[in-house]
């Protein structure tokens, strides 16, 4: 209802100048919210914490925890389909990379539910479906596991593989890329590269 009252003036480059539409000034965007023209994202975070609290397991355990995590994800997708059928608006589950909001959400959960070991006892919650950073896991196993959750995040998702300096092992970079291609998943793999550049004045800087 709030969006239906918005006009093209809120973002002229999007709604007036062709990025998304060519509406007139002050024209309502209401009609463009319906019938497949645009999508409303249902973002989520903290799947690990949810599963840990409900089952006592991580969603990475390939057992009870993972099964429950996939059920939660399927339920989110089912609700999106239900809302779409009722409202003629596309909804889609989005594996949210919420960045700094992980700290805000953790603080809110702690204030609401208190300190729960393994759930609210950290200063952050885990992004979307990601394997929590404190769990040790092989890079390829991580991709394989997270691929199943990416399938249930059709509105957008990304998996991260943090790597050391791989400049001496380009084959490892190649294998990561081919694995991501094989699973048809969105992957980011930031890694350290130590370089020395020179400015136009000839003085080096790191």
Per-region residue spans from a language model:
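Long, C-terminal-biased catalytic regions of enzyme "large/alpha" subunits
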Residues: 1-206
